[in-house]
Amino acid sequence: MAKLVVVIQCDIVQKKCVGYACMKSFYERSGRFNGYDADTRYLTVTCGGCCGAGVAGKIEDLNRKLKRWGDDRKDVVIHLASCVVSDNYHRPPCPHRDYIKEIIERKGYPVI
């Protein structure tokens, strides 16, 4: 089971959204966060801006931090936030969501 859940938020939406609903869902273990252990940690980062290519650099930074702190990357799972994948009150789904998912998967992480 994952020990760290990383949530990728839309860079544009993040400028006006604090991510409270995502955080609340995580701590209540509702929706896509159902089933995570109580000691699972939570981290949010943005995609880096359109077209999402910046997420590659952010994942490389995450890899360096995991190594430095002795954490195993196999304990990390990445979620795409609702502002990226769904049509909601912020905006329509990100047109680059499949590209972002592909980058994350190429870096060896599961994407939810």
Kindly give the residue locations of the regions a language model identified:
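Acidic (Asp/Glu)-rich catalytic clusters
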Residues: 70-72
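Conserved mixed alpha/beta catalytic, RNA-binding, or beta-rich assembly cores of soluble enzyme
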Residues: 1-68, 89-96, 102, 106-110
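Active-site nucleophile-His-acid catalytic modules used for acyl/amide transfer and hydrolysis
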Residues: 79-83, 88-89
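Structural motif
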Residues: 4-6, 76-79
